[in-house]
Amino acid sequence: MKLAVIPGDGIGVEVTAEALKVLRKLVPDLQTTEYDLGARRYNATGELLPDADLAAIREHDAILLGAIGDPSVTPGVLERGLLLNMRFALDHHVNLRPSQLYPGSKSPLAAQPDIDFVVVREGTEGPYTGNGGAIRVGTPHEIATEVSINTWFGAERVVRYAFALAQTRRKHVTLIHKTNVLSNAGAIWTRAVETVSAEYPDVETAYCHIDAATIYMVTDPSRFDVIVTDNLFGDIITDLAGAVTGGIGLAASGNIDASGTNPSMFEPVHGSAPDIAGQGIADPTAAILSAALLLRHLGRDGDAARIEAAVEADLASRGDSKVVTSEVGDRIAAAL
C-alpha cells in the first residue's frame, strides 16, 4: 500500500504518527511518502500546493492528513489554497463522516441508545466554489453575492454513493436540504434521490429540512442511518454530529473520489490546536479512526473493524485518566 502522508501543522504531526503506528501493525508492506504542506512551508516559501507535489500525491493509493492551520497564517489562505484546491484537483466529491457514540465517550446524549449514522456530504459544489463577488465595497450600497452551484451530475453521484452505502447498513437514506426555500437546487437533489432510489427498492428514504434535522439530531439521532446532503448543509450538520457523538476530537472523515480515479484523503475532523501542540496530550483517536476509514475504503474491512473494536475498548477503559498521545497509540496498536 502506497500512502501519501501530510502531517500538517500543530497536533497534526503528533496524531498522524500514532495513526501510522496503528496502520503499520496491520499493513506490513505499508510504503509512506511524507509531504511538507501547511503553515510551516507556506511561511518559509510561500508555497501552498505545488504542482509537483500534487502530481506525486496522485500516484498513491490514499492520503492521510493530520491537520492544517496556524495563527501565523491569515485565516482562509491555507483552507482555500491547500485544502479546497486539493479537494477540487482530486475530485473529492464525497465527504464521508461516520458518527457513532462509543461507550465511555463524553456526550450530552450519552444516555441515547444506538447513535450510529453516516453523513454523506457533497464536497465540490454549492457555495464553496468561489462563484461570487462584491461591488461598492465600503460604501452604504455595498453588495456581495455567493452563488451556490448545484449540478445533476454532482448531486446524482453523491446520492448514488449514499444509497450504495445504505445497502451495507440499515438500508435507510435521509435527504437533508431546504427545498421549500431553495427550490431550484432542492429540485435537483429531490429528483436525484427519487431516481436512484428506484434502483434500491429495499432502501427506505426520508426527507428533513436542515433546521428540523438539527433538532432531530439532538432529540432523536437514532432515526438516522445514512444522511445525504449538499456542501453547505453538510458542513453544518457534520459538526453537530461530532458534538453529539463525543466531540470532534473523536470524529474521523474521508474526502473521497468515488470513481477511484484519484486517491482519497482521510483526516481527523479536529484542527491543528496550536495551543496544545508539542505537549503530547492531543487525543489521536480521530486520526486512528480515520486510518480505519482509509482501510475500509481500500477494501480491507476486516482490518478496519479491528481498529474500530480496539478504539471502542480503549475509550471504554479510559475513565477520567488524562490522555497521553503516544500511550493511546501504543494501547490501540498493542490490541491489534
From Swiss-Prot:
Keywords on record? Amino-acid biosynthesis, Branched-chain amino acid biosynthesis, Cytoplasm, Leucine biosynthesis, Magnesium, Manganese, Metal-binding, NAD, Oxidoreductase
- Record's subcellular location: Cytoplasm
Q: What coarse category fits the chief subcellular location reported for this protein?
A: cytoplasm
EC class of the enzyme, as a word:
oxidoreductase
Q: How cofactor binds (record note)?
A: Binds 1 Mg(2+) or Mn(2+) ion per subunit.
Q: Where is this site: Important for catalysis?
A: Y128, K178
Q: Which Gene3D superfamilies match?
A: Isopropylmalate Dehydrogenase
Pathway membership, UniProt: Amino-acid biosynthesis; L-leucine biosynthesis; L-leucine from 3-methyl-2-oxobutanoate: step 3/4
Query: Quaternary structure?
Result: Homodimer.
Q: PANTHER family recorded for this chain?
A: D-MALATE DEHYDROGENASE [DECARBOXYLATING]
What is the name listed in the Swiss-Prot or TrEMBL entry for this protein?
Answer: 3-isopropylmalate dehydrogenase
Q: Which organism is it from?
A: Rhodococcus jostii (strain RHA1)
Upper taxonomic lineage: Bacteria, Bacillati, Actinomycetota, Actinomycetes, Mycobacteriales
Which gene does this sequence derive from?
Answer: leuB
